[in-house]
């Protein structure tokens, strides 16, 4: 499995395979695809920048137009559908192997489908990912390896350390403070960059 792609199956994986190259050409990365509903489903696309900075509402608009156009052409979904595009946010989901490595040292929560040593839910410090497993150091100091292919959900926990790290990622290139200068960059609130109106594509007509 490509460490740059989220772990998905079925129709979600099919849509991801179509969308990911489009985002890459625009300088973005696919974080998550979720298709909700059966009749007139909503296709939720979560993305971030390839350089690690969070996307803005304007980015969501651009992604929505580009992704909507290619989905119209490839037509993976029968009937009418609605497209929603949002930023991954600060306390983002961990859907790719690279996420576990990129955010190593930060607190996260994860839940697997099949119990490991009698439990499905885990909370601890990210230690990275290797060979299809994400590693956590739990509160008692023990380490656990969770199969990414069996991950039900995993996401970062909002902490002061994560907010500070996100503030650095949100800077534009060349925007870092000079040595000795106070960093006054504020982290975006949860869901920043989400575009419920501009990033929402009207349902297309049924063929």
From Swiss-Prot:
Similarity-based family: Belongs to the RimP family.
GO CC terms: cytosol
One record GO biological process: translation
Organism of origin: Gluconacetobacter diazotrophicus (strain ATCC 49037 / DSM 5601 / CCUG 37298 / CIP 103539 / LMG 7603 / PAl5)
Region ranges (Disordered): 171-207
Signal peptide (residue range): none
Function: Required for maturation of 30S ribosomal subunits.
Lineage of origin: Bacteria, Pseudomonadati, Pseudomonadota, Alphaproteobacteria, Acetobacterales
Family annotation (HAMAP family): RimP (MF_01077)
One Pfam family here: DUF150_C
Biased composition, class Basic residues, residue ranges: 197-207
Protein name (Swiss-Prot/TrEMBL): Ribosome maturation factor RimP
Keyword Cytoplasm on entry: yes
Key words of the record: Cytoplasm, Ribosome biogenesis
InterPro entries according to UniProt: Ribosome_maturation_RimP, RimP_C, RimP_C_sf, RimP_N, RimP_N_sf
Organism superkingdom: Bacteria
Location(s), subcellular: Cytoplasm
Gene3D superfamilies assigned: Ribosome maturation factor RimP, C-terminal domain, RimP-like superfamily, N-terminal
Main localisation: cytoplasm
